[in-house]
From Swiss-Prot:
Disulfide bond residue pairs: none
SUPFAM superfamilies the UniProt entry points to: YggU-like
Pfam families: DUF167
GO cellular component: cytoplasm
NCBIfam families to which the protein is assigned, alphabetical: DUF167 family protein (TIGR00251)
Source taxon at top rank: Bacteria
Protein's name according to its UniProt entry: UPF0235 protein Pmen_4153
Protein family per UniProt: Belongs to the UPF0235 family.
């Protein structure tokens, strides 16, 4: 199992979120999930909104192209990124067919 899979042109990511970190960053793998550290606190959806904005910037898409599929109230989240324009340097992550 991998922390990502392609669904057509959409990238599905399984993440482990660490809110209230000192900086926003990809932090390697946490089991079979991509660990992401965010500065936002886990209150009133702030960490989720911050996560969507962070991923949109990292993958070169508009915020509307990143959606939370599951894990709204959990550290374990599944996200969909529609047609990413670029891929950050992450373990094993490549565009399909390459």
């Amino acid at each position: 199992m991998s922390y990502f899979r392609w669904d057509g042109e959409d990238l599905i990511l399984d993440c482990h979120l660490q809110p209230k970190a000192s900086k926003d960053e990809f932090a390697g793998l946490h089991g079979e999930r991509l660990k992401i550290r965010l500065t936002a606190p886990p209150v009133e959806g702030k960490a989720n909104a911050h996560l969507l904005a962070f991923l949109a910037k990292a993958f070169g898409v508009a915020k509307a192209q990143v959606s939370l599929e599951s894990g709204e109230l959990n550290r374990h989240k599944r996200l969909r990124i529609h047609a990413p324009q670029r891929l950050p340097t992450l373990p094993g992550l490549i565009f399909p067919g390459k």
